[in-house]
Amino acid sequence: MHVRAPWSLPEPTLAYFPNARFVPSDRDLGAGALRLVGEDCPAPTRGGVAVADGPTEPGFNDFHHVPVLAQRCVELLRPALTRHHADGSEAVLVDATIGAGGHAERFLTELPGLRLIGLDRDPSALEIVRTRLARFADRVTLVHTRYDGLASALTELGYGAAQSIDGALFDLGVSSMQLDQAERGFAYSKDAPLDMRMNPQSALSAADIINTYDEAALADILHRYGEERFARRIAARIIRRRADKPFTTTAELVALLYEAIPAAARRTGGHPAKRTFQALRIAVNDELGSLRSAIPAAMDALAVGGRIVVMAYQSLEDRIVKRVFADAVASRTPMDLPVELPGHGPRFRSLTHGAERADAAEVERNPRSAPVRLRALERLELEALPRQGTGKGES
């Protein structure tokens, strides 16, 4: 999910979020809006999932959005979405990270019969996308949930959690809209409350972690999620500093990080706060845990012939996607058998050779695409098929 602002972020922020880039757009985002059920009247909270659908009054900050690898996403997902009808009728696409709706707009425009379900944990993002997609209101349902709430959302909407959709799209990474809102506390280049919650309604903030976790837990978070080699040193400094006064702002934490990280490392390793801020953001929002649950849930929800596309922007996310996809395309039939045992063959086939990267033309058009790693799969029938190149009887 990526949102563009009409002005550039300071370079230190770009060092921390290399996928946050800004490209002029001539798109008219429209004046209508989809209505979030529960905004101005009580709504059922079945399983904690709030459903958004229907018209409402516009309320929109003028953020713009250039979707990453949009054409490639369309190429990969179109065969699954047009299996029933060429215009996408009877097909359902789940955009699990709808953000500002750039990818969703592209699919809804090109496939005028397509039904789209958009998920996002950030109420601000849903405010933006409901305006952008207003002209498609009869074909769009927005759901306020993390992407690991996909199965629950589908169930509550009447689709079911198994083999009920034709496509799933995940555009991982940080929204530059969130970065630009200083009060959210994501950008270390701006002094703001030490928050970092993608969903402001969530209980845990970065300040809670910094001020209450013990030294070992802090070091583990910084090392595991930020791959910070000075994790123990930073954690020890945090414990000493907070004994005098709790941390409340990003500037206070940045100042400590400048002191904790050796000068030589500061000169060569980019901004000293980038790894710590990444680690805290991931921990606050349980980004990796959510992803580990969300990808298998999306794959289970795909009907036979359905497809999933995932775009990751940093190695921790991509490793998770790579492992889940590798397991899905592997056969569970013993290698010495000449045929696949029923129910033991690969459940999916890969549509990409490893991870695809943006080409030079795409990066030139949209610099935010530079770090992207795209992977895609298609769901298969589980049948007994001849083994290729292995097993008994091989000559």
Curated annotation (Swiss-Prot):
Pfam families per the UniProt record, alphabetical: Methyltransf_5
Residues forming coiled coils: none
GO terms classed as biological process: rRNA base methylation
Could you give one GO CC term from the UniProt record? Answer: cytoplasm
What reaction does this catalyse?
Answer: cytidine(1402) in 16S rRNA + S-adenosyl-L-methionine = N(4)-methylcytidine(1402) in 16S rRNA + S-adenosyl-L-homocysteine + H(+)
Keywords from the named record = Cytoplasm, Methyltransferase, rRNA processing, S-adenosyl-L-methionine, Transferase
> Record-annotated residues binding S-adenosyl-L-methionine?
101-103, 120, 147, 171, 178
Catalytic EC class: transferase
Q: What is its EC number?
A: 2.1.1.199
Return the similarity comment. Answer: Belongs to the methyltransferase superfamily. RsmH family.
Function (record text)? Specifically methylates the N4 position of cytidine in position 1402 (C1402) of 16S rRNA.
Q: List, alphabetically, the NCBIfam families matched.
A: 16S rRNA (cytosine(1402)-N(4))-methyltransferase RsmH
| Name this polypeptide is given | Ribosomal RNA small subunit methyltransferase H
Organism encoding this protein:
Mycobacterium marinum (strain ATCC BAA-535 / M)
- Tell me the gene name: rsmH
